[in-house]
């Protein structure tokens, strides 16, 4: 590992540590997403708390946190395995942000951003998988889990040399959703539509 790669890994973690959900919630005068709603500082929870505008900004920022360092590394011809490490560093920053007392999100949008440099076709398939799952089941967490599990297989069809790197990212996302997985098995996970409608009734 070269000093440049090490510097990019550190930079990816620090960039990932910028919690856009918390900052944008402050900008919109919304409750802290770490202490409200699902307690997850991510776009889905901000959608429940503040609506589409704030959630869209959070989503874009979270995607960019993963995309920028990996895209830079991609154009520097850094090998696929190290690209995976850089993507994981960005996701770990999002999940355990040093600037926000290590209270972060699930890392789904940041992981999607990290996968984007592999190809827009792969990104489209992953987004489609998530949307279809959420549309059918209503569970955002299940959409994330199924998309994470499908990502290595889809990558193998598109660019097989990146399968190992994507598999590492997928494992991180699945592990981060262990609480959601337990609630799904227990039938206690709340559907995203129920949470949004509940918020609307409170207004």
From Swiss-Prot:
Keyword Transcription regulation among record annotations: no
Enzyme Commission designation: 2.3.1.275
Intrachain disulfide bonds: none
Subcellular localization, as worded in the UniProt entry: Cell inner membrane
Molecular function terms from GO: acyl-phosphate glycerol-3-phosphate acyltransferase activity
Pfam families: G3P_acyltransf (PF02660)
Pathway(s) it belongs to: Lipid metabolism; phospholipid metabolism
Catalysis: reaction(s): an acyl phosphate + sn-glycerol 3-phosphate = a 1-acyl-sn-glycero-3-phosphate + phosphate
Record key words, sorted: Cell inner membrane, Cell membrane, Lipid biosynthesis, Lipid metabolism, Membrane, Phospholipid biosynthesis, Phospholipid metabolism, Transferase, Transmembrane, Transmembrane helix
Topology in membrane: Multi-pass membrane protein
InterPro entries documented for this protein: G3P_acylTferase_PlsY
GO cellular component: a single term: plasma membrane
Transmembrane feature ranges: 4-24, 80-100, 116-136, 138-158
BP GO terms, sorted: phospholipid biosynthetic process
Keyword RNA-binding appears in the UniProt entry: no
Function: Catalyzes the transfer of an acyl group from acyl-phosphate (acyl-PO(4)) to glycerol-3-phosphate (G3P) to form lysophosphatidic acid (LPA). This enzyme utilizes acyl-phosphate as fatty acyl donor, but not acyl-CoA or acyl-ACP.
HAMAP family to which the protein is assigned, alphabetical: PlsY
Family, per entry: Belongs to the PlsY family.
Assembly description: Probably interacts with PlsX.
Identification of the protein by name: Glycerol-3-phosphate acyltransferase
UniProt organism field: Photobacterium profundum (strain SS9)
Protein encoded by which gene: plsY
